[in-house]
Swiss-Prot record:
Organism in which the protein naturally occurs: Centruroides limbatus
Taxonomic classification: Eukaryota, Metazoa, Ecdysozoa, Arthropoda, Chelicerata
Annotated tissue distribution: Expressed by the venom gland.
Subcellular compartments: Secreted
Matching InterPro entries: Scorpion_toxin-like_sf, Scorpion_toxinS_K_inh
Protein name: Hongotoxin-4
Domain statement: Has the structural arrangement of an alpha-helix connected to antiparallel beta-sheets by disulfide bonds (CS-alpha/beta).
Main localization of the protein described in the UniProt heading: secreted
Length: 23
């Protein structure tokens, strides 16, 4: 899965992006 470059931290990401961090 490609990580969204706008997401630098799970805390500031939307749920779909947080999932990319495994959170």
């Amino acid at each position: 899965k490609v990580i969204d470059v706008k997401c630098t931290s799970p805390k500031q990401c939307l749920p779909p992006c947080k999932a990319q961090f495994g959170d």
